[in-house]
Swiss-Prot record:
It is found in: Cytoplasm. This is Translation initiation factor IF-2. Residues 105-114, 182-197, 313-329 have a biased composition (Low complexity). Residues 67-86, 101-133, 146-385 are annotated as: Disordered. Residues 474-643 form the tr-type G domain. Gene3D superfamilies: P-loop containing nucleotide triphosphate hydrolases, Putative DNA-binding domain, N-terminal subdomain of bacterial translation initiation factor IF2, Translation factors, Translation initiation factor IF- 2, domain 3. SUPFAM superfamilies: Initiation factor IF2/eIF5b, domain 3, P-loop containing nucleoside triphosphate hydrolases, Putative DNA-binding domain, Translation proteins. Residues 619-621 are annotated as: G5. Residues 483-490 are annotated as: G1. Belongs to the TRAFAC class translation factor GTPase superfamily. Classic translation factor GTPase family. IF-2 subfamily. Its main location: cytoplasm. It comes from Burkholderia vietnamiensis (strain G4 / LMG 22486) (Burkholderia cepacia (strain R1808)). Residues 529-532 are annotated as: G3.
Length: 974
């Protein structure tokens, strides 16, 4: 829905309308209320304003770097006088910075906006510019007034201070003059006294008195002049200090005004300037004599790394910071006016900086250290052992590889392997350990092991499952029809649904689990039809898990059978009520009373006997008793008070899953609570995806499915496992994360189980000798059939012949399956699937046997026959005759020959023989020769004499008996 006003746009952005109005006004879009119309231009201006306020800039390149390389050759004589040619490569790099990008971009943007906007937009912008100019002018005027006020106040204060200072100086001068006059009067008085005394003493003393008076006057004048000079100096210092303070205040005010103007003119974005680390001060290089070949001596302390430069104070001027840099640049210049020789290249090579070396390559090498320090005493590379061991807390998941476990403990994987070898287990670096073993290894290495499930997204899924506030409404019951094979379950459902499903099933037996919902006058019922064959145990267990009521179908002419007992066990395990339907009552041999007695023996007691299970006689053929059965089912549902939320995310269970060649993974699910809509994101085990299509049991598209409704969905990432829980999530990213986690967890657990079973299987094979394997690849149409067929074939394994399932999956037979069969020498079994054209050609070329079946009986019987052919044949002995020794002859180079009489049966040349003496077997072997007179014969019959010799046996005496027998091989069966 397009947003036409401010309120709709705020609802679309999921934010308050008041906040949106403030942002629009900040962007210059004048909107007064939530009902004002909003155009695309207004939205574009708001977006541009938000981008600028968050610091978004264009990513165009602003500088170009050009690198030039020039190669030349110079000739230099070495110490021996030979001329050497040296390649000199000069590289120059120049960077051009485009500084007017911002201005050009602003001009282009203004030009484009000016062309695109209408007259009203131009007037509005002019008004905004005028207001901004007035605001800036007002701020500048206020700043000027503030400066003038400060200057006026400063001038008045300075005038007051100057007047006070002048008054103080005048008072000091008057006091000094008074003191000088007093001193002069005292001096005159003293001089007068001295003159009087001098007159009395000598007439020549008058001249001395005058000189003393003149000296006193000069001293007084010097004292007064010195005091006046000190006062003038103090006044000048005060005036300079006041002027400096006024100048600083003026500069601060100007800086503040400049900052305000920049803030008003620049967009609101903050660019944090990266703080450059202080560069270490390089020691000055000694001047090298040009043309010298020897290595100049190092000055004292050259090997010591220079201390880092002291940080500059905040108020340092640029002049003070640039002077040392300029000096350093002068010191780093090459001698000889910048023309470098080959000795400069050697110095560069010596000064190359390596990783971890901050000294610029100085003193590198095992001879480079200062005097008194060896090559192993370098402080930069000396290893210091930790003072105490570090004990880490290691979180051990359910499965972890040796490499990951070592990484968690911050040690090498070889250390973990050593510990495992000491514990008697040989492991590799990629081997997966179970949680218990890994925790033992962690404790053995001195760390603390904690069993934890880290980064488990399923924990977040469980935490997110809160009690739904949706209203609990009545839902239809889910009824599972169970019973023995051929007892009429599907036929009963066909009569209820007015359909004919049983006629279309191979062999007349159900091999898939089916889900249907039927609308009756009293309400809706959802039926699950489960297979009755013994191979489909897991499928029946899934049906009992997802059901509310079990309808147990028992044939009146057959009674309780093994799968009937199993269905009763499934229903009791799930705590599900049972409604017994005694089917085929229209047959003459039907005996419902016998069925009731057999069911009572299994713990299912009818209501007429005081139990809680209703028994309903029905006939799927004539339809008798169907209405009573449905009424009993709905009555049980009313007693259970089945309720589920409707307006909530859907939850359910996978009834069946398959891989369709055109549709991809398809899953039949039963919604248990909530409503499943087309487009929802679902998670089913390790599969996830968006519901692209949703079909009901009749193959018709539907948009939603409520509680207890079975639907077929498409759009999953892979075929989910039958029986997996289905849940609707709001975020596809979260669904993918949980699905990938489940896949990895399943793979790790599977690898751990395989690793644990390797040794056991190896010991079993060593104890049992050679075991024949029948490798099979199974492809089925749906998940349940594939699971049932695999379990049925694995049950055929014996101690001598084992069924090895190389691969089993859902879908058609592809080239990958044929290639896998070629590598593993396996037979491919397709259950209700076929191979495509490429797979058939590849199978014919490689001689791979592909067998197709649509009835599980046939597949099991043929695999059983193939296994029988692989059994070692049974050897049986058949006694063909008895011979009595009459005379013994010693023949040179031949040995002992017995003259015999055939007393019973027949003696053949290829037969084996036992030598009996006093009816005790003393030797078993083969005949070496059989003669009659001097001729070799093939056989001698009863009543004839013959000569016989036994291979490798000469201890024959008269009276011995030879028992002649043959060994025949008899084929065995399973």
């Amino acid at each position: 829905m397009a947003s036409n006003n401010v309120a709709q746009f705020a609802a679309e952005l999921k934010m308050p309308a008041g906040v949106l109005l403030e942002q629009l006004q900040a962007a210059g879009v004048q909107k007064a209320s939530e009902d004002d119309a909003l155009s695309e231009t207004d939205k574009a201006r708001l977006l541009d304003h938000l981008r600028k306020s968050h610091g978004a800039t264009d990513g165009d390149k602003r500088k170009i770097t050009l690198t030039r390389k020039h190669t030349s050759e110079i000739k230099q004589s070495d110490a021996t006088g030979k001329a050497r040619t040296i390649q000199v490569e000069v590289r120059k790099k120049r960077t051009f910075v485009k500084r007017d990008d911002v201005a050009e971009g602003a001009e282009q943007g203004q030009a484009q906006v000016a062309e695109a906007d209408d007259d009203a937009e131009l007037k509005r912008r002019e008004e905004e510019a005028r207001r901004e100019a007035e605001l800036l002018e007002q701020q500048a005027q206020e700043l000027l007034e503030r400066q003038e006020r400060l200057e006026r106040e400063e001038a008045e204060r300075r005038a007051r201070e100057e007047a006070a200072e002048a008054e103080r100086r005048r008072a000091e001068e008057e006091a000094a003059a008074k003191r000088a006059a007093a001193e002069a009067a005292a001096a005159q008085q003293a001089a007068a006294q001295q003159a009087a005394e001098a007159k009395q003493e000598a007439p020549g003393a008058q001249s001395a008195q005058e000189e003393a008076r003149a000296a006193a006057e000069r001293a007084a004048q010097r004292e007064a002049a010195k005091k006046a000079e000190d006062a003038a100096r103090e006044a000048a210092d005060k005036a300079r200090a006041e002027q400096e303070e006024i100048r600083k205040r003026r500069e601060a005010a100007e800086a503040e005004a400049r900052a305000i103007r920049e803030m008003m003119n620049t967009p609101r974005k903050a660019v944090v300037k990266a703080v450059e680390p202080p560069k270490p001060v390089e020691a000055p290089k000694p001047a090298e004599a040009k043309g010298t070949l020897h290595k100049p001596a190092k000055p004292a302390g050259a090997g010591v790394q220079a201390r880092p430069a002291v940080k500059k104070p905040a108020g340092a001027t640029p002049a003070t910071t640039q002077a040392p840099a300029a000096g350093a640049g002068d010191r780093n210049k090459k001698p000889g006016g910048g023309k470098g020789g080959w000795q400069d290249d050697a110095a560069k090579r010596r000064g190359i900086k390596t990783r971890g070396d901050s000294s610029g390559g100085v003193d590198r090498g095992w001879r480079g250290g200062p005097k008194g320090r060896g090559r192993h005493q370098d402080s930069a590379s000396t290893f210091q052992a930790p003072t105490e061991p570090i004990v880490r807390e290691v979180h051990v998941p359910e499965t972890i590889s040796v490499a990951d476990l070592a990484h968690k403990m911050s040690i090498k994987a070889s250390e973990v392997i050593k510990v495992m070898m000491k514990m008697g287990q040989m492991v590799t670096i990629n081997q997966v350990l179970d949680q218990e073993t890994a925790m033992i290894v962690v404790e053995e290495l001195g760390h603390r092991a904690v069993a934890a499930k880290l980064d488990d997204p399923e924990a977040l899924l469980v935490e997110g499952e809160t009690s739904s506030d949706a209203e609990q409404l009545p839902r239809p019951p889910v009824v599972t029809v169970m019973g023995h094979v051929d007892h009429g379950k599907t036929s009963l459902l066909d009569h209820i649904r007015r359909a004919k499903v049983a006629a279309g099933e191979a062999g007349g037996i159900t091999q898939h689990i089916g889900a249907y919902h039927v609308e009756t006058p009293r309400g809706v019922i959802t039926f699950l039809d489960t297979p009755g064959h013994e191979a489909f145990t897991a499928m029946r267990a899934r049906g009992a898990k997802a059901t509310d009521i079990v309808v147990l179908v028992v044939a009146a002419d057959d009674g309780v059978m093994p799968q009937t007992k199993e269905a009763i066990a499934h229903a009791k395990a799930g705590g599900v009520p049972i409604v017994v339907a005694i089917n085929k009552i229209d047959k003459p041999e039907a005996n419902p009373d016998r069925v009731k007695q057999e069911l009572v023996a299994e713990g299912v007691v009818p209501e007429e006997y005081g139990g809680d299970s209703p028994f309903v006689p029905v006939s799927a053929k004539t339809g008798a008793g169907i209405d009573d059965l449905l009424e009993n089912v709905l009555l049980q549902a009313e007693v259970l008070e089945l309720k589920a939320p409707v307006e909530a995310p859907a939850k359910g269970i996978v009834i069946e899953a398959k891989l369709d060649k055109g549709k991809g993974p398809v899953a039949t699910i039963l919604v248990q609570s909530g409503t499943l809509n087309r487009g929802d994101i679902v998670l089913a085990g390790s599969a996830y995806g968006r519901v692209r299509a949703m079909l009901d049991e009749n193959g018709k598209p539907t948009k939603e499915a409520g509680p207890s409704i079975p639907v077929e969905i498409q759009g999953l990432s892979e075929v989910p496992g039958a029986g997996e829980e289905v849940i609707v999530l709001p975020d596809e990213r979260k669904a993918r994360e949980i699905a990938l986690f489940r896949q990895g967890k399943f793979r790790d657990v599977k690898l751990a189980k395989q690793q644990a079973a390797k040794l056991e299987s190896m010991l079993e094979q060593m104890g049992e000798g050679e075991v024949q394997n029948l490798p099979l690849i199974i492809k089925a149409d749906v998940q349940g059939s594939q699971e049932a067929l695999v379990q049925s074939l694995l049950k055929l394994s014996t101690d001598e012949v084992r069924v090895q399932i190389v691969h089993s999956a859902v879908g058609g037979i592809s080239e990958n399956d044929v290639n896998l069969a070629t590598a593993s020498k396996a037979v491919i079994i397709g259950f209700n699937t076929r191979a495509d054209a490429q797979a058939r050609k590849l199978a014919e070329a490689n001689g791979i046997d592909i067998r197709y079946y649509n009835i599980i009986y046939d597949a099991v019987d043929e695999v059983k026959a193939a296994m029988s052919g692989m059994l070692a044949p049974e050897k049986r002995e058949v006694i063909t005759g008895m011979v009595e020794v009459r005379q013994v002859f010693k023949v040179p180079k031949i040995g002992t020959v017995a003259g015999c009489m055939v007393t019973d049966g027949i003696v053949k040349r290829s037969s084996s023989v036992r030598v009996l003496r006093n009816n005790v077997v003393i030797f078993t072997g083969e005949l070496e020769s059989l003669k009659r007179f001097k001729d070799d014969v093939k056989e001698v019959k009863q009543g004839f004499e013959c000569g016989m010799s036994v291979k490798n046996f000469n201890d024959i005496v008269e009276g011995d008996q030879f028992e002649v027998f043959e060994v025949t091989e008899v084929a065995r069966t399973l």
